[in-house]
């Protein structure tokens, strides 16, 4: 299976992963890109930032702008709505994964 096809299948899980980490602590794009690489996902900033913006637009993340060593950095934290969606997504993902590996 091609890398593009596989990446397309995992985009939903990447969004859940973003919400999961944003629930633990504020995240920002560059650092989160490293987190995804740890799990074997090579995702460009041209893909990652639109995902972050869409999650913010949908009310699942909130952006906080901070000045870090003279640089403006945009951090994202989960919202109440985002946390509710995360809990539901985790439950559904677990159900699917359990089914995939039940044999």
Feature map (PLM): residue ranges:
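Beta-hairpin "wing" of winged helix-turn-helix
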Residues: 58-72, 77
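Basic amphipathic alpha-helical segments that dock to polyanions
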Residues: 48-50, 54-55
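Basic, amphipathic "hinge/linker" alpha-helix immediately C-terminal to the N-terminal HTH DNA-binding motif
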Residues: 72-90
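A cross-family signal for key residues in well-ordered alpha-helices
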Residues: 17-20, 53, 87
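Amphipathic alpha-helical dimerization/coiled-coil segments
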Residues: 87-103
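Short, intrinsically disordered or compositionally biased N-terminal tails of bacterial proteins
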Residues: 1-5
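N-terminal helix-turn-helix DNA-binding core of bacterial DNA-binding proteins
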Residues: 6-47
């Amino acid at each position: 299976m091609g890398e593009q096809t596989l990446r397309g299948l995992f985009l939903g899980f990447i969004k859940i992963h973003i919400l999961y980490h944003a629930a633990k602590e504020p995240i920002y794009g560059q650092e989160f890109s490293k987190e995804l690489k740890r799990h074997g996902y090579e995702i460009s900033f041209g893909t990652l930032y639109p995902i972050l913006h869409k999650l913010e637009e949908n009310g699942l993340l909130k952006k906080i702008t901070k000045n870090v060593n003279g640089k403006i950095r945009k951090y994202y934290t989960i919202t109440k709505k985002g946390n509710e969606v995360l809990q539901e997504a985790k439950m559904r993902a677990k159900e699917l994964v359990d089914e995939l590996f039940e044999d």
